[in-house]
């Protein structure tokens, strides 16, 4: 019984870390083909178009996509519930970026997600504070 308790105590942090890592992983959708639109949808902070902080001005989502020597910085946006065109939702926790890869192979992505008053229009790439649940998230997908 004591050995089982020790094993549980040792495994708990690892399981929690895996759960946190999975929480930041985006849903990747679209045709994973050259020149086709690929969409990454992240679960991020819950926001409202009418609320404070404002999701369009006070947050900035940038995703850098790399493949070999190719590197693209793509801005993302607040997508409310992820289906606002059909639901008319003005609040939610979905954040989205679209990308059309110009080469086959493994594409890596790295997320910069920051929050501050007016950060979306700031020229400073380090403006605002990192949003811990998404900032620094990395991953890959294959084209």
Segments from the language model and where they lie:
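Bacterial N-terminal signal peptides
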Residues: 7-17
């Amino acid at each position: 019984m004591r050995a089982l308790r020790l094993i549980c105590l040792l495994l708990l942090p690892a399981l929690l870390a895996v759960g946190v890592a999975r929480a930041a992983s985006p849903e990747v959708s679209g045709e994973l083909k050259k020149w086709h639109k690929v969409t990454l949808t992240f679960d991020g902070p819950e926001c409202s178009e009418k609320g404070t902080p404002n999701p369009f001005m006070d947050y900035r989502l940038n995703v850098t996509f790399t493949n070999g020597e190719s590197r693209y910085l793509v801005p993302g946006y607040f997508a409310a519930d992820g289906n606002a065109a059909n639901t008319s939702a003005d609040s939610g926790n979905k954040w989205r970026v679209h990308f059309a890869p110009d080469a086959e192979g493994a594409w890596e992505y790295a997320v910069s997600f920051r929050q501050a008053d007016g950060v979306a229009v700031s020229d400073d790439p380090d403006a605002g504070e990192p949003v811990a649940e998404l900032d620094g998230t990395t991953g890959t997908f294959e084209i």
